[in-house]
Curated annotation (Swiss-Prot):
Enzyme class: transferase
Organism of derivation: Clostridium novyi (strain NT)
Record keywords: Amino-acid biosynthesis, Aromatic amino acid biosynthesis, Cytoplasm, Transferase
Organism lineage: Bacteria, Bacillati, Bacillota, Clostridia, Eubacteriales
Stated name of the protein: 3-phosphoshikimate 1-carboxyvinyltransferase
Gene Ontology cellular-component annotations: cytoplasm
Length: 435
């Protein structure tokens, strides 16, 4: 089902939102760095999570799917993770597939094994920037080898405690990688943020997850993070929360047509993408927020200016909502989307234009003049999960079918997306396009 044809229809029903990919990465790593056994509940085996599991296994961590003995009949998996304090390199190559989190989290962690290791990947990940780490390698005398700053990357050396200067306007994944490494070194460290920190929510998730596993990091107003050395992570059982960045697609689906209730979204979550609630409220959406669910109904929405610096993953679906909202929607501070799985600003401008939206790229965002209806047509996912899902939701407001090429890009984060889309009334057919 690489290419699919969607017949426009309004969606109605309940969706059990998949677990947070951001929290699943962090929980698996925290458990792996904790001496003893942890059971991590509510896991789906998306391509990115499989990459992190492979990576941790390469570092000598035992991980086993125990769903049948732990929670028989559950749609979601439970992992038994046998962690250890001292990492041992069991495989000298770590394949990160297309997962930026896996790559950037595990590079500094792997240096604790003090053995040469090579990181590989594919797709856009091969060329996504790693300059923050290259600077650290050079400052600390860690050997590394790469061709034109692209994967594969081979590193060999030992990371030492100290001061680490990191720009705040590049990916927070580098900060997370350091936070998963520095507490376990023989000495205290400090991460100093040299520009305004964006995506604070992801850093909050890291600090909170580490704390739940017994590791403390002092946050000095997001300007510096003070980290005591020689800490120990403690094994525990942990349930991964539902994912607001995935829930956002069905939250908007309810706004565009009929009534959708998204389940397993914790209103007290630290996830930055919880911002979807306030953003759609400001746009005039009919939304009801419960303790662990969000319900949206068909609404007349209006354009606003959206600062995406703290919630970049919401931009594709917010662009869809803007395209069918009254007036003008402007998305700003989203320049980092140009170095995601694809250039998401260009992708959304290109693909929404194909189905009749009035949308233009800005250097750091998008400007969208809303229309009541879109027309349908052939679009491409750019092999990006969020583009594929956004275009599926856009079909609700189309007058003709939408054909999405490379639709299985959703496997990166949400393998059951098409099943869930049909569950609430989406009508899809496989579409060969000559294949």
């Amino acid at each position: 089902m690489e290419n699919i044809k969607i017949i426009p229809s309004e969606l109605n029903g309940e969706i059990n939102i998949p677990p947070s990919k951001s929290l699943a990465h962090r929980a698996i790593i925290s458990a792996g760095l904790s001496e003893g056994v942890s059971n991590i509940e509510n896991i789906i085996f998306s391509e990115d999570i499989k990459a992190t599991i492979r990576g941790m296994k390469s570092l000598g961590i035992e991980i086993e799917d125990i769903t049948n003995e732990y929670k028989k009949g559950s749609e979601r998996s439970t992992l038994k993770v046998i962690g250890k304090e001292k990492l041992t390199l069991e495989n000298d190559t770590i394949d990160c597939s297309e997962s930026g989190s896996t790559l950037r989290f595990l590079i500094p962690i792997a240096l604790r094994a003090e053995k040469e290791v090579t990181f590989t990947g594919r797709g856009k990940l091969v060329s996504r920037p790693l300059d923050v780490y290259y600077n650290i390698f050079e400052n600390q005398g860690i050997k590394y080898k790469t061709s034109n700053n692209e994967l594969p990357l081979t590193v060999d050396g030992k990371i030492n405690p100290g001061e680490f200067h990191v720009k705040g306007n590049v990916s927070s994944q580098f900060i997370t990688g350091l936070m998963y490494t520095l507490p376990f070194l023989d000495g205290d460290s400090k991460i100093i943020i040299t520009t305004e920190l964006e995506s604070k929510g992801y850093v909050d998730l890291t600090i909170d997850t580490l704390k739940k596993f017994g590791v403390e990091i002092e946050n000095n107003n997001y300007k510096e993070f003070i980290i005591k050395g020689n800490q120990k992570s403690t094994s525990r059982d942990y349930r991964v929360q539902g994912d607001f960045s995935q829930g956002a697609f069905f939250i908007v689906a309810g706004i565009l047509g009929s009534n959708v209730k998204t389940l397993d979204l914790d209103i007290d979550s630290l996830q930055g993408d919880k911002a979807i609630i306030d953003i759609v409220k400001k746009m005039g959406a009919n939304i009801k927020v419960g303790r662990d669910y969000i319900e949206t109904k068909k609404s007349k929405t209006h354009g606003i200016t959206i600062d995406a610096s703290e919630c970049p993953d919401l931009v594709p679906i917010l662009a869809v909502l803007g395209a069918v909202s009254h007036g003008t929607t402007k998305i700003i501070n989203a320049e980092r989307l140009r170095i995601k799985e694809c250039d998401r600003l260009k992708a959304m401008a290109t693909e929404l234009s194909k189905i009749g939206a009035d949308i233009k790229e800005l250097e750091d965002g998008l400007i969208i003049k809303g229309k009541y209806k879109l027309k349908g047509g052939v679009v491409d996912s750019w092999n990006d999960h969020r583009i594929a899902m956004a275009m599926a939701i856009a079909s609700i407001k189309c007058t003709e079918p939408v054909i999405i090429q490379n639709s299985m890009a959703v496997n990166k984060s949400y393998p059951d997306f098409w099943k869930d889309f049909e569950k609430v009334g989406g009508i899809i057919d496989e579409w060969s396009m000559g294949k």
